[in-house]
Regions:
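Pre-Walker A (Motif I) flank of P-loop NTPase domains
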Residues: 1-4
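Hydrophobic anchor at the beta1->P-loop junction of P-loop NTPases
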Residues: 7
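P-loop (Walker A) phosphate-binding loop of NTP-binding proteins
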Residues: 10
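Conserved lysine of the Walker
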Residues: 15
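Post-Walker A alpha-helix
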Residues: 18-19
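Conserved substrate/cofactor phosphate-moiety recognition/catalytic segment
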Residues: 24-67
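A glycine- and Lys/Arg-enriched "phosphate-lid" helix/loop adjacent to the NTP-binding pocket
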Residues: 87-158
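NTP-dependent small-molecule kinase module
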Residues: 135-194
């Protein structure tokens, strides 16, 4: 079974850019969020009724990706992941009222069952950046943003509540506020953890 690294953090922090930078340095099997390919993402942006379908689609996708990456001979590297989609996005959706209590409970049950069947990632790289940096990065994006810069504090709170439950050796926290697109400071630190 291959190793798995999850890169997590709020929208706009640089998860995809870091995964790309790491992939240029070492051969990883990678998995991305695939916003454009997700059938409910654009629908949800237009109509909040699609909140549950969007969340379940992502949770299922991420579980499928984890299973595939674990089967690879290479170390797996995920842009986001199952844990981020539940602890960050599903909780954010519930807080905003985009998921009802029973819908959120369905997401929780699916996540807990799935996580009990799939090994926890070997390393979770938690990216943080200042709100100003995240706001600027989100403004430059050319894709659908469900979470906004205003959601960053709440999103980070949800992640922190989960992250404190993890063993310290499984977690690498990086403030990437000053990083460029090559992540010259962070890439060596992550590679040293492998």
């Amino acid at each position: 079974m291959g190793k798995l690294i999850e890169v997590i953090g709020p929208s706009g922090v640089g998860k995809t850019t870091l995964v790309n930078a790491l992939s240029r340095k070492t051969q990883f099997a990678t998995a991305y969020e695939g916003h454009i390919e997700r059938p409910f993402q654009a629908l949800f942006k237009q109509d909040r009724r699609y909140g549950l379908a969007n969340q379940m689609d992502y949770l299922i996708l991420r579980a499928e990706q984890e299973k595939e990456l674990r089967a690879s001979a290479s170390t797996g590297l995920m842009d986001g992941g199952l844990d981020l989609d539940y602890h960050g996005f599903a909780r954010l959706f519930y807080a905003h009222g985009w998921l009802s209590k029973s819908e959120f409970d369905l997401c929780r049950r699916f996540y807990e069952l799935t996580r009990s069947l799939l090994q926890v990632p070997d390393l979770i790289v938690h990216l943080t950046a200042s709100e100003e940096i995240i706001r600027a990065r989100l403004a430059l994006r050319q894709r659908i943003n469900i979470a906004s810069a205003e959601d960053t504090v709440l999103f980070n709170q949800f992640l922190d509540e989960w992250l404190v439950t993890l063993p310290a050796e499984q977690l690498l926290r990086l403030d990437v506020s000053a990083e460029d697109t090559e992540f010259g400071q962070s890439v060596p630190r992550i590679l040293a953890q492998l």
